[in-house]
From Swiss-Prot:
Membrane topology: Multi-pass membrane protein
Organism listed in the record: Homo sapiens
Location of the protein in the cell: Cell membrane
Main function: Odorant receptor.
Sugar-modified residues: 5
Pfam families xref list: 7tm_4
UniProt GO MF annotations: G protein-coupled receptor activity; olfactory receptor activity
Matching InterPro entries: GPCR_Rhodpsn, GPCR_Rhodpsn_7TM, Olfact_rcpt, OR51/52/56-like
Protein name: Olfactory receptor 52J3
Topology Cytoplasmic: residue spans: 49-56, 123-141, 219-238, 296-311
SUPFAM superfamilies for the chain: Family A G protein-coupled receptor-like
């Protein structure tokens, strides 16, 4: 069914296939996805609870970690429950407006995650390269400003995607070979010119690349400062403060780069591999981030044990 809007036809609903080629295995696939989603919910909720309860965890690093956990909860919840609805209840149809809203939220929260990782890199840079000025540089006003940038820039970058989708005519095609709605997945169903959609998508990706470059530059300075320290123990201690952040960066960027490369150049790779990678990209980082910080950050590890064992 279609409705007419200023000479542009939009479908009332889209049909999300799920994982094309693996429809018969949806029920089996749902188990691991549900388990990982529950780990993401429990892990990030625990991080937020510990940071809220423990007054000693008030450093900027934990402030950014709380933001990261909030974004991870939002990102995974935006995509996984809808996906499980497809796997468990054959709830394939999604309203046109709901599909565009899901697209906006997924892209916006993904952008926010990239922004908060950049902010955390700046925090580690100041902590290692200018430790005596840490408190004077990362003041509460600066933290508020960084927090606003974390939210505002991805939202501003994602909003044009909504317009670029609404301007497109959709003649008869309404089947999306995916388990969630994303920008180019919707655009490719259009019978209009989607060149501007592709160009803008690459423009947005360039900001992810820029963030990664800036993170890399910050770690060049961090490593230079670390290797100038007089003792081996001091070097290890300084590097250990960055270990969790490096792990989270790898968890976020490696799947995203792999997903991008397989989508752009892996034309011989089966379609279900593309979709599985895209799904893992949205659920693996939110589930692993709290585990990485719980294992690698002494304060978090000790406080988690304290909060859940104290009487």
């Amino acid at each position: 069914m279609f409705y007419h809007n200023k000479s542009i036809f939009h479908p009332v609903t889209f049909f999300l296939i799920g994982i094309p080629g693996l429809e018969d295995f949806h029920m089996w696939i749902s188990g691991p996805f549900c388990s990982v989603y529950l780990v993401a919910l429990l892990g990030n909720a625990t991080i937020l609870l510990v940071i809220k309860v423990e007054q000693t965890l008030r450093e900027p690093m934990f402030y950014f970690l709380a933001i990261l956990s909030t974004i991870d909860l939002a990102l995974s919840t935006t995509s996984v429950p809808r996906m499980l609805g497809i796997f468990w209840f054959d709830a394939h149809e999604i309203n046109y407006g709901a599909c565009v809203a899901q697209m906006f939220l997924i892209h916006a929260f993904t952008g926010m995650e990239a922004e908060v990782l950049l902010a955390m890199a700046f925090d580690r840079y100041v902590a290692v390269c200018a430790p005596l000025h840490y408190a004077t540089i990362l003041t509460s006003q600066v933290l508020v400003g960084i927090s606003m940038c974390i939210v505002i820039r991805p939202v501003l970058l994602t909003l044009p995607m909504v317009y670029l989708i609404y301007r497109l005519p959709f003649c008869q095609a309404h089947i999306i070979a995916h388990s969630y709605c994303e920008h180019m997945g919707i655009a490719k169903l259009s019978c209009g010119n989607i060149r501007i959609n592709g160009i803008y998508g690459l423009f947005v990706v360039s900001f992810f690349v820029l963030n990664l470059v800036l993170i890399g530059i910050s770690y060049v300075y961090i490593l230079r400062a670390v290797f100038r320290l007089p003792s081996h123990d001091a070097q290890l201690k300084a590097l250990s403060t960055c270990g969790a952040h490096v792990g989270v960066i790898c968890v976020f960027y490696i799947p995203s780069v792999f997903s991008f490369l397989t989508h752009r150049f892996g034309h011989q790779i089966p379609g279900y591999i593309h979709i599985l990678v895209a799904n893992l990209y949205l659920i693996i980082p939110p589930s692993l981030n709290p585990i990485i910080y719980g294992v690698r950050t002494k304060q978090i590890r000790e406080r988690v044990l304290y909060v859940f064992t104290k009487k």
